[in-house]
UniProtKB/Swiss-Prot annotation:
<keyword id="KW-0611">Plant defense</keyword>
<keyword id="KW-1015">Disulfide bond</keyword>
<dbReference type="GO" id="GO:0031640">
    <property type="term" value="P:killing of cells of another organism"/>
</dbReference>
<keyword id="KW-0929">Antimicrobial</keyword>
<feature type="disulfide bond">
    <location>
        <begin position="56"/>
        <end position="82"/>
    </location>
</feature>
<keyword id="KW-0295">Fungicide</keyword>
<comment type="similarity">
    <text>Belongs to the DEFL family.</text>
</comment>
<feature type="disulfide bond">
    <location>
        <begin position="47"/>
        <end position="80"/>
    </location>
</feature>
<dbReference type="GO" id="GO:0005576">
    <property type="term" value="C:extracellular region"/>
</dbReference>
<keyword id="KW-0964">Secreted</keyword>
<keyword id="KW-0732">Signal</keyword>
<feature type="disulfide bond">
    <location>
        <begin position="38"/>
        <end position="71"/>
    </location>
</feature>
<protein>
    <recommendedName>
        <fullName>Putative defensin-like protein 317</fullName>
    </recommendedName>
</protein>
<dbReference type="GO" id="GO:0050832">
    <property type="term" value="P:defense response to fungus"/>
</dbReference>
<feature type="signal peptide">
    <location>
        <begin position="1"/>
        <end position="24"/>
    </location>
</feature>
């Protein structure tokens, strides 16, 4: 019973601190994309000669190309640079 009371008090203190900070257990918003879609079942060609872009398109028919050079379809990892179709 003592350990339950201690755990409850710790959670209560943590909650009060969160409320004082102002975020109060809010769910973080997904960041806005910083780049464009790598393609969506449409063949897209990079306008820049970048092997990472070509690999991203070859391995994935859709996804976001991140600044690290990896392609992802996870919306919360939209840290990418602009990819667009060549004329």
């Amino acid at each position: 019973m003592k350990s339950f009371l201690v755990a409850f008090l710790i959670v209560l203190v943590f909650f009060c601190v969160e409320m004082k900070i102002g975020n109060g257990f809010k769910i973080h918003e997904v960041p806005e994309p910083t780049g464009k879609w790598c393609g969506y079942s449409v063949p897209m060609k990079p306008c820049i000669n970048d092997d990472r872009v070509k690999r991203c398109i070859a391995e994935n028919t859709h996804g976001w190309l991140m600044a690290t050079g990896m392609c992802t379809s996870i919306p919360s990892l939209k840290d990418c640079y602009c990819m667009h179709q060549c004329p």
